[in-house]
Structure formats: structure tokens, C-alpha cells
Amino acid sequence: MFKNKHIVVGICGGIAAFKAAGLVSRLRQQGGDVHCIMTKNATKLVTPITFGELSGNNVTVDMFSNIYKWDVEHIALANLADIFVIAPATADIIGKVANGIADDMLSTTIMATKAKVLFVPSMNTNMYENPIVCQNIRKLRDLGYEFVEPESGHLACNTNGKGRFPELDKIIFQMQRILYGRHLLKGKNVVISAGGTKENIDPVRYIGNRSSGRMGYAIAKAAAMEDANVTLVSCTKSLPVPDGINVVYVENARELNTSMNLYYDSSDVIIMAAAVADYRPVNQSDHKIKKEENSSLDIKLELNPDILLELGKRKKKQFLVGFAAETNAVIRHGQEKIKKKNLDMLIANDVAMPGAGFNVTTNIASILYKDGTMQQYPKMTKEELGKIIIEKVAERL
């Protein structure tokens, strides 16, 4: 993931400094050449030896340690870096950089680099919400510096609020976006549905399908990577949501229909990756149906709304993408669906094939277009396919 990338991690003297050890370890495991700069206060919380062992490189603290041979050290690291990650970023380092202060190894190196800098603030809630800190963050954002928002929860100061060090996956996602994103969908509003709807029979049982939601989440991540404004309408709560994505949770087809229509007019791209139940029970019991009371059970069903069909009828400027999970005549059924539902693009796959379809991490797909052209792809991970789908959408906008 970070092969051949030179990553400089700045560790400041916040209580979350120990969590940076996990970040450094992950980055190295994923192929990164990781170099650590610690402030003197950070060394009072975690020893430089820890970060040296985890990174496989010398750790810099002192301005004049001459670790990097003949080169002026802060310039050597500044020139080496493909990306800087300041984690945890304290109010002190944010204030220094925002106001041009370079008085230690970390602040001096940040000032000297032309690489992208990603701040990961972590501090007491009152400090984070202090107007001066907020002003400094806004100033840095305006200057092109990037931030990962801290999380809310229980803090080391025994209070609850915003300021917790974020999950490593969120930091790594933002690093990927900065390093590999091409801004293909910058400024575009993309709405993606994911997962399988559930139609209640009673409070315990439901009619559903085998969709895990992984494909929709992979597409959402790929769209966010390309700087889209992503809204993910999700029928599942079991998957982690990538950073920077607005998620709306729904359960059944009617709720999904309401949400998709709510965001439709303001969207540039709609991708219907959710697996929607065609039918729902006419009557839903408000209590668990006991088998002792029913020797047999007949459930009368009625049609759910055809969400994709209705979105196709409403289409104006939107680029509309659908999915077709089939077990035979996949291409023919896909071509028919494009015409019937007024789609611009459709991802078709044979869910009967091993390694394709529901509840697996891979997929085998064909991408069909309204002009009659198509592209077929071999078995790949859903994340890889998600990137391809977003690239193809961007090409045709």
C-alpha cells in the first residue's frame, strides 16, 4: 500500500503519543519507509527506542544530532518525505505551524518540506474547541494543510467529548487519498447505496438477501479517495465507514427509497449497489410469531417500489449506475436492464460463479454502458473493482 513511499511521522507530547506507535508499525508493515521525529515532550511519554524499533530507522529529536550524515538534518527529512503525518498533533504544533514558528526539529522540518502535511489533532475537548486553536486549524486548512478529525468519547482527562485520537484506518485512508488520489470527482456529489434490505415478518424474523454491503462500501471509499462528496445510504451497520463519508442507515426498501430520493436532486452521480428485496410482507406482526401457535405459516407478499426504475424516470443531469446480480444470461439481462431503467452504466455479475457476488471479498464483473459497449474484468477484490467503477464513472461524466 505504501511501497516505496517515504513517510515522516511527527510525534508530539500528547497523551495519545503511545497510539502513534501502532500507526508507525502499520505503515511499515504496508511497505512504507517510515522516519520519526519526536518533540522533547513526546520522549517523556514514549521512548525514542520504541519508534526506532517499530520504524526500522533512527529517530530524530535534537536539531543537531547529525543522523542524516552531511545534509542539514531538517532539510534532509523535508526533502525525503512523500508525506508528513503529525500524530498526535497538539495545540502547540498546530499553533507553531499556523504562525510560522520553527523552533525545534519537528516545526522546522514541517516548514522546510514541500510534501503534503496531514495533522491528526488529539487533545482535551476545551483545548480543541478553543477559538484560537480553531482559528489556527482554519488558517492551516486554507493554506492547504490536511486534517483528520478527532473522535468523540472518553478522554484521558476523565471527561467525554471531542478530541480522541482517531482510529488508525481513518488516518491511513486519508494518507492513501493524499498520496494516490487524482481528484477525479472533486466537487461532485455522489450518492451510493449498499447492503441488503430487510423486510420484517415479525420483530425477530425478516425477508432479506445475502448482500454484505462490501461492494457498495468499496465504491464509496474509492469515490471519497477521488475527492467526491459522498453520501452512503447503507442497509448494514457491520462495516467500518471510511473517513469523510456521510452515512445514512436504513433497513427496508421503503426507507431506502425515501433516502435515495431525498439526495437525488442534488446529486451528480447515483450508484445503486444495494440489493433490494423485490417483495415485503403485507402484514408485519408486532410480536414474535410462535411456532406452537402455527402448525404452518403463510406469508402474503406485495411488491416493493422499484427504486432504480423510478430514479431513471426522474433522471435529468445525474449519471445513474445500477447493478445486476444474475445466475444466467448475465450480459443479455444487463443490457435489458440498462434500457428499461434508463441507466448510464451497469455492473453485471454472475453470482453463481465461485468468487463472485454476495458475502465474499472478491467479484467477477462486466461493466456495460448505455451506448452498447462493455468491458469484462477477471476476478479481483471488491476494493479493486470499486476503484475501476469510479474511474469509469469519472471518464464518462
Map each language-model feature to its residues.
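A cross-family phosphate/adenosyl-ligand binding-site feature
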Residues: M1-F119, N124-G213, Y217-L397
